[in-house]
């Protein structure tokens, strides 16, 4: 039993390091592009739309998925890279301020224009569908054709709210 506990601890450590590296890369890339003064591919990246996020992406975090917990259950006020605002008791949705905070937090896990280059989409996706194997919440999305995965990908590609 102790061997499994040690293995689990190592997996958690590796995952934490990956998330820290992803977060640092997300923060460093824009700063490097700005300081170099050179045009970069990121300048051509689509802007992430807050209204699309609020109306189409946030509900996915609250949605119960078959055989899985809601994203929110593990990621509210957590120390994960995906750290969603905690809902007040009795509230089914976030306030405007909380949604703005969620938008800022979740945007750090996105490489605009590149769904598979975005931790937000790659991490909960099944490895055989292009995801990674480190999501402790399981395979939230079995394929890139999952309607919710496609909605997240649309947002990352710059889809605007209608």
Where are these regions (language model features)?
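Positively charged n-region of N-terminal signal peptides that target proteins for export
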Residues: 1-4
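Aromatic- and Gly/Pro-enriched helix-to-coil junctions and flexible linker segments
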Residues: 21-162
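Bacterial N-terminal signal peptides
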Residues: 7-19
């Amino acid at each position: 039993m102790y061997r499994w506990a040690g293995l689990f601890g190592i997996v958690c450590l590796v995952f934490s390091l990956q998330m820290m590296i992803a977060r640092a890369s997300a923060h460093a890339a824009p700063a490097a592009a700005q300081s170099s003064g050179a045009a970069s591919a990121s300048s051509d990246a689509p802007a992430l739309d807050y209204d699309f996020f609020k109306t189409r992406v946030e509900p996915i975090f609250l949605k119960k998925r078959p055989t899985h917990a809601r994203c929110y259950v593990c990621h509210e006020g957590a120390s994960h890279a995906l750290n969603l605002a905690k809902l007040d008791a009795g509230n089914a949705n976030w306030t405007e301020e909380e949604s703005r905070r969620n938008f800022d937090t979740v945007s750090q896990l996105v490489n605009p224009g590149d769904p598979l280059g975005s931790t937000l989409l790659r991490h909960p996706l099944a490895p055989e569908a292009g995801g990674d194997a480190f999501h402790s919440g399981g395979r939230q999305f079995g394929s890139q054709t999952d309607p919710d995965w496609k909605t997240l990908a649309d947002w990352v590609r710059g889809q605007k709210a209608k």
